Amino acid sequence: MAMICAQAPLAFADQSQQENTGNVRHFHLHGSGTTNPSKLIWLAMDKLEEMAGSTLRMTYRSVGSGTGASDWASANAGDFASTDYGLAADSSAPFMQLPFQIGAVSLFHNVPGVGTGVMKLSACTVAKIFTGAITNWNDAAIAADSGLSLPSQTIKVIWRSNGSSSTYGLKGYMYAGCQAVYSTAPTPSDGADPFSGNHLYSTGVTGSDSMRLAIGANEYSIGYIDAGHGHLDNLSEVSLKNANNEWVVTKEGDPAGRLTANIPAVVTSTVKATFPQNSGATNYAGDWSGVNLFNKAGAGVWPICAFTYLHVRTTYTDTATTGVVRAFVEYMLSPAIQDKITEFYFYPLDSAFAAEVKTAVSTTLSAASPVWTWVDPYILSYNTGIAMGYTTFSPKRQTYAEYERGLFKKNIAALEASVAALKTELAAKTGNDDAADERTLALAAVSFVVAVIAVIVGSIAMCRGGRSSQVMRVVGM
């Protein structure tokens, strides 16, 4: 029993070996890599474990693209990896490189009174700022781009000190958009202090959270981060000029009259022609190290985009592992997960492209045995042997923890609606009705206390439900 419940070590571990004999069926899947999709991957793994007809244990180490790539290059280190950039092919151990989501890197600033989209910066102006050629917000180049008269304040340049896909994306944009200023081709391995120059003020931070906090805490600063997380903190986004000479932002609603970019539209037929090819078709087992989505042409295209990849072997020593890997990747490319990506501040693939990648996976991993089967929850008449089979995923299989999470989300939504209504009521009060104000404040206080209690109770119930479901699975075995 202890062997069943223990977590398998992942770093530099061999490929998983499945137990699939007689009535003993225990399946495993382990990977590591970039932090960006970690929450999405964990969600997908939770759902698959829940829906599986057999004991299924899946883990993902959120360690960064660099460590994930190093793990992957170390013989049979785990079953899959994930990075925010393509890797070189390995003829001795062939593997597929499978895009499954798109990230958009944005520039955010903290110039008081200048909101999202108001400030426009071309690639050359951005390059001059980050190389120290421009050090003051009242520089003529900034005024020419934006039409703004900004105060004479030192630009506080904030950059990632530990190497990141965001730095790679920004340098790729500057290189693709203005080689007259920035002529060094970027590489994913660019590490600490990636921008040299005569900055009057610059500082490095580690991680996306540190970046967003640093921008928010320092007036007259500028930095870069994946777009969704910047918007989460209501940071002011810079409007960038794309290859079609459009001033675009990633923020929804065309703020300041700027065009909201269509992120998935970056994958045009022209871009797909730059993918590795084999007999006129995309070679997902080819060399993807030269593929990028920087400053690509197209209407409404955002100029700093990047794929997030899943890397999986073309063959595994255990065909049952092939089956689990195939099922996991197919699920990541299915509408069930693609539709969730925006909740984690990234962007899904175009549905046709996602289907193409999914077909490539299914074809390449056709040696899977067993092949996991998906049961459609809306079919009233189905083969019971399939639905109750060991290697099936059925949405009808759920846990109490999942049920509690659903209630928890509904309660939070109701609370948010109540708070919004209270804000509207308070905003509408223009007189000196102290009694009404006191009633409203009292109601708000009661609502807040009830909400806190609901959150605490919901969290406890959710955790207890999760533990209970795990115990029930072990007992059931």
Which role does the model predict for each range below?
Residues 3-17:
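N-terminal signal peptide
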Residues 466-477:
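Intrinsically disordered cytoplasmic terminal tails of membrane proteins
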Residues 18, 420, 449, 470-471:
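Serine/proline-rich low-complexity intrinsically disordered segments, especially terminal tails, linkers
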Residues 4-8, 136, 454, 458-462:
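Hydrophobic membrane-targeting signal helices
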Residues 14-426, 432:
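Flexible loop/hinge segments at secondary-structure junctions
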Residues 435-468:
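Single-pass membrane-anchoring alpha-helices
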